[in-house]
Amino acid sequence: MYQGRPTAPGGEVLKSDWFRYWRWADGDEKVIELRAEGFAHDVPADAGLVFQTIDLAASLKSSADYTVIQTWMRIRADKAHHFLLFDSVRRRMDGPELIAAVEAGVAKWKPRIVGVESSGFQLAICQMLKKKGIPVREVRPDRDKLSRALAATPAMEAGRVWFPASAPWRHDLEAELLGFPASAHDDQVDCLSMAIGGFVHLPSTFTPAPVNISTSPAHQRAQKFLDIARPFDYGGQPSTIRESDGGVYLEEED
């Protein structure tokens, strides 16, 4: 049962058997421990690509959707990409509070890329965030929510998606995932789908557009130039991040 709605035991689309958990291997929070049956890997906390996915909703009404800001790190282990969820902010916010929350998240986590689902009012917010030097990539879904969630299931079923074991919000997140698509809200599902099933996928015609953000204090750890894609649809060909002297690029995989 999630928010008064019955849910299938173990999940309808996203299964509880697929959930994996990462932990800090030391008190200094410098090494991440990944442990599952047949899999053991230790990862330096700064070893991966940090990015964010955001699902915007600008309303304080009790019936409104939530704004969700998720922070992820993508690493490569055993010749496969793994996605580690670091943080998830989920609350109802109006416009000014929403902008401030995104700025705070960027300042704290210093993501290379911030994916924002953009349509309607979100387009204006994306432009405001870009003007503040935030490395926004607009994401325009070309499929329904269920299809996008299904695109994320292979990585989850393969044990390549990891949640923080000790996060206070973890149980609410899992309840929403297991309740999908019957749950009253699916904002966290949308962000997860974007991160795993769409955010690192680009059309074959993708061309990076360089944006200089070197003067932004929130991005002191970023490259001098960060190449930010034009708006793109979920789908396309799998891509990887390549770093060069000129910035960060997403390239198609063979």
List each model region and its residues.
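Acidic two-metal-ion nuclease catalytic site recognized across multiple nuclease folds
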Residues: 11-14, 196-254
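Mg2+-dependent endonuclease catalytic cores in nucleic-acid-processing enzymes, primarily RNase H-like
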Residues: 5-9, 13, 17, 68-70, ...
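An active-site-proximal beta-strand-loop segment
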Residues: 54-67
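Short glycine/threonine-rich catalytic loop with a Thr-x-Gly-x-Asp
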Residues: 184-185
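Short, function-defining helix-loop hinge/capping sites that tune catalysis or transport
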Residues: 49, 63, 69, 125, ...
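ATPase catalytic-site recognition across NTP-hydrolyzing enzymes
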Residues: 1-56
